[in-house]
């Protein structure tokens, strides 16, 4: 067995049945092994698309996603996807070819120090330096990617090592991830919770990554505590939970932001006090003591000092804190905040109102539908107006905010869950970033649906130029967009273009009931903004609702 064949053998041993990639010279031996190696390979049209498809696959399944690329430009094209996976704590293993070992450091054709490049955007990176260490490195790569706080790992394999043959022994390893249960700290936290008059649960993406959604929901059922979610935490709390206040932060609900500003105890669960959540940090939850629960000790006290820091598995910590609470007045106050600041969908004129369209999509989509988004105004509207059922059913780039993420992530999700509906919500700016992945959709006849909100603008940047840069609209106009339906048709994808709100419901039904891939091109008002908004440098109490 040569090194390339061992790579494929190691993938099978890890339970990997699908990988995403793009071949090239330095990775050709691995592709030769994939030819009849028992692992399905999905050919993407760009290595960045392969990395983001691997993220979508990982998010939709909870498994480790795998992407493969050649040396040089193939490897560098993975970098944005790896950075995205790192910031959102997604388990991904990237396998790259490298020039043969004797040529490393000689500026050989398509040689790039991808190990050095990737150090800042991976949890760990390996350069395989001998055939004998390949089994260990492949095993450790998967252990590191999915243990503790998950993240991306890169394995760079010189071509001569891929071709070398030898008797390789399986390597069995597990990363030591035992965390001592913090008994004393848990007891202190229980006492704080029992005394609190206005407790609030702040739920982040770590809950879904820890597969702790059932534990969280049991905790809420027992405590009846008001709760809010970050962008990546959406779906962890059931949308119909009576005391769920919606998303927190810059484009969060007024109810969530106001309640957090009032609370006297904030329990952060798998969350990291990101700047898009907190607004002006020293004014965030000013009256609250903080209990911070997370698997990653590096997040403790990084941005907000915790009165009690609980490091460990959320599946153990949440039940340990669970207790009935007497907080009727606070519960009713939060429910009243939610009712007072609920979304309003009345909108004058015939133009399509994007928030209402997404609400109508939410009402129609199947229960197990996976929604992916790109980045921009449409992303925030999707976060606000779609009822999210589980974290794995809402896949978005929250930490890095990567335009072009939505379509390849939808590809990965659809491959992972072929029997579920997958809808990609995109904007005309983001869509063009990785539009080539329509070729992947066509090649595999993936039945994913695309809702393309087209305002002929880079909408979020334009909104900020309008609000904070004196309406100096610099390079945010996209009036030269292609004919999106004709573009989709060139890839054999059917679609429809709508411009009026009375067309929306029928168009959504047609899209969702279509058998194959479908593009719904939606023209919206170029000046429609995302509200509410916490301005830069402001407190979450100072939300803008409209232009003054």
Swiss-Prot record:
Transmembrane segments: none annotated. Thiamine diphosphate binds at residue 47. InterPro entries: Acetolactate_synth_lsu, AHAS_TPP, DHS-like_NAD/FAD-binding_dom, THDP-binding, Thiamin_PyroP_enz_cen_dom, Thiamin_PyroP_enz_TPP-bd_dom, TPP-bd_CS, TPP_enz. Keywords: Amino-acid biosynthesis, Branched-chain amino acid biosynthesis, FAD, Flavoprotein, Magnesium, Metal-binding, Thiamine pyrophosphate, Transferase. Its cofactor is FAD; Mg(2+); thiamine diphosphate. Pathway: Amino-acid biosynthesis; L-isoleucine biosynthesis; L-isoleucine from 2-oxobutanoate: step 1/4; Amino-acid biosynthesis; L-valine biosynthesis; L-valine from pyruvate: step 1/4. It holds the Pfam family TPP_enzyme_N. One of its GO terms (cellular component) is acetolactate synthase complex. The keyword Ribonucleoprotein does not apply. It catalyses: 2 pyruvate + H(+) = (2S)-2-acetolactate + CO2. Inhibited by the herbicides chlorimuron ethyl, chlorsulfuron and imazapyr. One of its GO terms (biological process) is L-valine biosynthetic process. Catalyzes the first step in the biosynthesis of branched-chain amino acids. E.coli contains genes for 3 AHAS isozymes: ilvBN, ilvGM and ilvIH. In strain K12 only the Val-inhibitable ilvBN and ilvIH are expressed; ilvGM has a frameshift that disturbs the ilvG reading frame. IlvG (this protein) is Val-resistant and is expressed in K12 strains having what used to be referred to as ilv0 mutations. The ilv02096 mutation (shown here, an insertion of 2 bp, PubMed:7015336) causes a frameshift which restores the open reading frame, permitting the expression of this isozyme. The inactive N-terminal pseudogene fragment is found here (AC P0DP89). Belongs to the TPP enzyme family. Tetramer of two large (IlvG) and two small (IlvM) chains. This is Acetolactate synthase isozyme 2 large subunit.
